[in-house]
Amino acid sequence: MDSKITNFDVIVVGGGHAGTEAALAAARMGVRTLLLTDNIDTLGQMSCNPAIGGIGKGHLVKEIDALGGAMAMAIDESGIQFRTLNASKGPAVRATRAQADRVLYRQAIRMRLENQVNLTIFQQSVEDLILEGDKVVGAETKMGLKFYAHQVVLTAGTFLAGRIHIGLQNYEGGRAGDAPSNRLAAKLRELALPVGRLKTGTPPRIDARTVDFEAMQMQPGDDPMPVFSYMGKVSMHPEQMPCYITYTNEQTHDFIRDSLDQSPMYSDAGEIDSVGPRYCPSIEDKVMRFSERNQHQVFIEPEGLTSNELYPNGISTSLPFETQMQIVQSMKGLENARIMRPGYAIEYDYFDPRGLRPTLETQAIHGLYFAGQINGTTGYEEAAAQGLLAGMNAARRAQMKEQWYPRRDEAYIGVLVDDLITLGTSEPYRMFTSRAEYRLMLREDNADQRLTAIGREFGLVDDARWLSFEGKMETMEAELARLKQTWIHPKHAEAKKAEALMDLPLSKEQTLFDLLKRPNVSYDALATMDMFGNAVTDPTVVEQIEIEAKYAGYIARQQEDIDKLRRAENVEIPDALDLDKISGLSNEVKQKLRDHKPATLGMASRISGITPAAVSLLLIYIKKLRKTSQSVG
């Protein structure tokens, strides 16, 4: 074959959420990219729940968008219900979530792929990697076609040696209706990469025509509707639909308990030994682990504007089909419901992410990158974030430029990757805001301020996004400066109005920025004062200004903590360090340090159970060692 057809700079294997972001990122950066997928029609497929975002996950989507990724715009064009979670709480934990029309979402992703310059899409499953020593040089497909590139991004999802379980029956599958990648899984195992097995699951799908919606609680979306992308507009959203809420009950739980002898997880005859996602457990796990509860909430979510399928979020199961029917029909509003697709569990291979560099390149094979569920994560958003980072770094490597990854204080993507490569995972990893030490700095609303300039530098951010970002930043900086320079004196004509806004006496001269720091003073309220002048009308800028004012003290303190950590972050832990000589370290801490072998104090600080006090002791001892070696020298 012509080398122009077979030779590329970057090859991406897999067309799920990780693979599509990886391929788009590499191509946007100007390198010739090939996306190999089993099925072009399932590019960007939502294999499980029809939703994007949520606590921690929405933050990842905003960061992907700030770096020029596709997920946020795709959900803005396909979302059929939008909500802001934790709206009454602080800005650090507020998160956007949207129900998606599966078909529209897939179309939005495919449109971007097919119109992306430098990107070639080819439908063929990959069965082998082409290696030269410890370097990857290409991939071989099922029909024997060989494609060459010195950078390969592998995003295999749940397809590596995938096995589907329904009751005590099981069969090979990458997901329902798709074949697994068994030969590729076997080849990867031959490379002696550290491999394990994980499990995930999905609920049965229900026919909306057989559901009594009036018997359930309606859950509408937010008004006004939020948007995901910094370039998004509410006008992009299609028609909106409500979700509904119902509950399991004691009868539901009895059906589940009575069928555990047919469960692939609980029965002695069952074949599932792998670990499932802790924060998205099956309904049988919920009933057994929380036996004191007599009900569990179930969200009935539409799958699309033109589909009759409903997704009952909260009853993922691998119990036999007959039991699944009993479970569904035992709930209020679903007494006559008909199942259109059974729920199932799926086991698959993943590789210990501690074998990765922070760029997501494998340590063992140069030029080979892993992204998504192959690294032990769960969720579309986690996969997409890894895909973008891996695709970007594969392109940087092809361009012979320095690779990049965000720190924990720069992005949730940095938290995600650092957790994986430092701690590994024994269960499917899901992002939460609680995983980030500096979540006040890593808000949804400021992801563009943290990452868009980096994306622009690397060629990920186009002109339109950059101009919009620059305009926003200029407006915000000018308004902040104006508020900090505009003073109001206790004898000013509008002092009484200021006091009414603050609900406090104006005892000394203050700036408008100082007034805005008060919890009960909003920007819009300040703007009613005659002395205020022309107010900013962009609500995203107003939100930023209010957060800057009201959280200024907290942000400053968190920045101090970050600066301290950075100073110690890269302090190397000597290989010959004798932990037994460090008085004050507990035996548990010593054992964890021996098990994980962190290279730096920063890595040590993120090991579960390693306290700040232990890190301080390590730092003191390392400094003493350095002084001793210098004096001896």
From Swiss-Prot:
FAD binds at G14, G15, G16, H17, A18, G19, V126, S181, Q373. This is tRNA uridine 5-carboxymethylaminomethyl modification enzyme MnmG. One of its GO terms (biological process) is tRNA methylation. NAD(+) binds at residues 276-290. The gene is mnmG. GO terms for cellular component: cytosol. Its cofactor is FAD. Its main location: cytoplasm. PANTHER family: GLUCOSE INHIBITED DIVISION PROTEIN A, PROTEIN MTO1 HOMOLOG, MITOCHONDRIAL. NAD-binding protein involved in the addition of a carboxymethylaminomethyl (cmnm) group at the wobble position (U34) of certain tRNAs, forming tRNA-cmnm(5)s(2)U34. PROSITE patterns: GIDA_1 (PS01280), GIDA_2 (PS01281). GO terms for molecular function: flavin adenine dinucleotide binding. InterPro entries: FAD/NAD-bd_sf (IPR036188), GIDA_C_N (IPR049312), MnmG (IPR004416), MnmG-rel (IPR002218), MnmG-rel_CS (IPR020595), MnmG_C (IPR026904), MnmG_C_subdom (IPR047001), MnmG_C_subdom_sf (IPR044920). It comes from Hydrogenovibrio crunogenus (strain DSM 25203 / XCL-2). Belongs to the MnmG family. Keywords: Cytoplasm, FAD, Flavoprotein, NAD, tRNA processing. Transmembrane segments: none annotated. It comes from the Bacteria. Homodimer. Heterotetramer of two MnmE and two MnmG subunits. It is found in: Cytoplasm.
